[in-house]
Amino acid sequence: MPKGGVARRATKIRAIRSETQNPVLLLDAGDTLFGQMLALQSEGRVIIEAMSAMGYDAMAVGQMDLAKGVDVLLARAKEARFPILSCNLVNAQEQKPIFQPYALLERGGVRFALLGVTEPAALEAPGVRDVAQVLDPVATVKKYLAELKGQSDVLIVLSHLGVEGDRALAQALPEIDLIVGGKSRRVMSAPDIVGSTVITQMGYDGEWLGRLDVTLDAQGQVRDPQSTVIELGPDVADDAELKALADSHKERFAQPTTEPAK
């Protein structure tokens, strides 16, 4: 039986939130919207609706999120109840970010800055090269770090650069506290530590949910990162609300049956 699904994911997310009094951030590093036929048929609406219902805080733009073009993803971003982030995917003519570059939020008295960064291969998505450019990730993130200085206690980068790109980013910009990565499809049972930057990544196709517990010391530094791999297998019960949402989209896009010849 296949793994994954938004209904199982929602069950685990609810459980995590119910068992802790600590702030919980729900984040996604991209390549999220078009991995399944239903997502393609709905132009990503089913995934955006599900993520909004689950209370996601932010996601980054990955190459596959642009599979239907920039305009479709912009439309989904307007519908989402969370920001879709990329600081370095810019309008080809004005050199301004196409999507929101970062988000600021506060949980439990802690100020978080969330910054999205997209891989150069995003230009290979249909029609993207005609309207957009991808700026150098390190230089662009560095520019925004200067802008965010003093506005946050914890700086998190949602990165679709891949593991090696994440490591290069951490080496160049040690002020980054945490990188939540995508693209490389790694299931990281333990975080990668580069200097003082914590790097994590959790698989592909929504088959796993990654949990990373961290402690903030008196100086606001991330300490003692503990990673948990949560497999969304058939033993995980479906959340009723998310199952109903997914089923409603399945019914809408179901192929009509062919009447037998008489």
Residue ranges and their predicted role:
Residues 1-262:
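Acidic, metal/ion-coordinating pockets
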